[in-house]
């Protein structure tokens, strides 16, 4: 469900989304606000979304039965004994600020800053590490991303070039770089083609093991 409204230079929007799978339920709500400035050559925007998910695990030998997946935390009595966490709810807050600027008749530039705060189970309940133990990820993840793009039109050639770049970092120690190049071509008045190349690279999380093996006392484990 999506609602949008416009009043002069202001634009306001909101949405609600519900989705469900056999072992997952998700509800999301969001708001967006934008304003145009300087004869519509500049647009400032802000967005916020909240997601409330519930994770479950299907029991392999009991058809139709699922149990809440609450991740795992070390027992207070024995750090090698992992017990269920406090909840199967994953709450995610996403917020972003955007800036678009028409610099010339043929050049548009954009800049966006995004932040997210996720709390709750975030691993795959069915996946195990190499030595057979369940995945265990931190219950909290905070991420910040910065992205920029430009779109340059070549009217005589009916082409537009669109370079993009995105960088993100989180408190798991993951850093990502994603440069991208898009080419838009108007072949016919009613036909346009687009070619895209994207390169993506990231480092591993701080708790990742290059061998895939973990000790029983390791607080976090991942099979990625």
Locations of the language-model features?
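Outer-membrane beta-barrel translocator/channel fold
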Residues: 1, 43-107, 115, 194-224
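Extracellular loop and loop/strand-boundary signature of outer-membrane beta-barrel proteins
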Residues: 15-19, 30-34, 79-85, 94-96, ...
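Transmembrane beta-strands of outer-membrane beta-barrel pores
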Residues: 7-9, 16-22, 35-37, 50-54, ...
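Residues that define the transmembrane beta-barrel architecture of outer-membrane proteins
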Residues: 6, 25-29, 89-95, 138-146, ...
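Outer-membrane beta-barrel channels and translocator barrels
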Residues: 7-10, 38-40, 104-106, 155-157, ...
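Outer membrane beta-barrel transmembrane domains
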Residues: 116, 121-151, 169-180, 184, ...
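Transmembrane beta-strands of outer-membrane beta-barrel proteins
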Residues: 12-14, 42-46, 109-111, 159-163, ...
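Residues on the lipid-exposed face of transmembrane beta-strands in outer-membrane beta-barrel proteins
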Residues: 3-5, 31-35, 97-101, 146-152, ...
